[in-house]
Amino acid sequence: MDTLTKPISAPRRRTTADTVYPILLLVSVTHLLNDMMQSVIPAVYPLLKAKFGFSFAQIGLITLVFQMTSSILQPFVGRYADRHPRPYSLAAGMCFTLAGLFALALAPGFAPILLAVALIGWGSSIFHPESSRVAQLASGGRKGLAQSIFQVGGNAGSAFGPLLAALVVIPYGQTSIMWF
């Protein structure tokens, strides 16, 4: 049989042995860091309310801006990421979040705080679709397990963030937010 008449073999089916656990663990750790940084926002509400004399409506608006930018934009970013995968968007999302934390740490009033939490939200909306895609690619067909490992990182970060904020931000003030 020459090469022209050889049957084409079916593509190799992925097996659970193809699960790339180091990648899953790394993306879970980045999810932990990302969500830890985000969870600082509600943890510092009492500090912001006391320092700037914000009303509960203003605190609610801070939450609204963060949630709108982190949640509403995410499906649009996810759709774009499906069509044009950009692995560097993981780092880009984290950079937006970091810039938002620095801005929040130095914000002198309400409007700059809104901009800071918007940056943090944009970081989240950029980070999550691509990192979830990476977890799925590393799953080796074990998508439920991969998503669970990925999600544990985010949930742990959401749990640790307020605790660390209580230990760091409350004693050292608003500028210590940039330590996250």
What is each PLM-predicted segment?
Residues 26-46, 54, 77:
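Extracytoplasmic
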Residues 27, 111-117:
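Short hydrophobic/alpha-helical segments at membrane-entry points of transmembrane helices
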Residues 39, 67-75, 158-159:
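Residue-level signature of mid-helix packing/kink "hotspots" within the transmembrane helices
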Residues 44-71:
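Extracellular/periplasmic helix-loop-helix junction of adjacent transmembrane segments
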Residues 72-110:
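Conserved MFS/SLC helix-loop-helix module at the cytosolic interface between two early adjacent transmembrane helices
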Residues 116-153:
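Cytoplasmic helix-loop-helix junction between adjacent transmembrane helices
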Residues 153-180:
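Helix-loop-helix hairpin linking two adjacent transmembrane segments in secondary transporters
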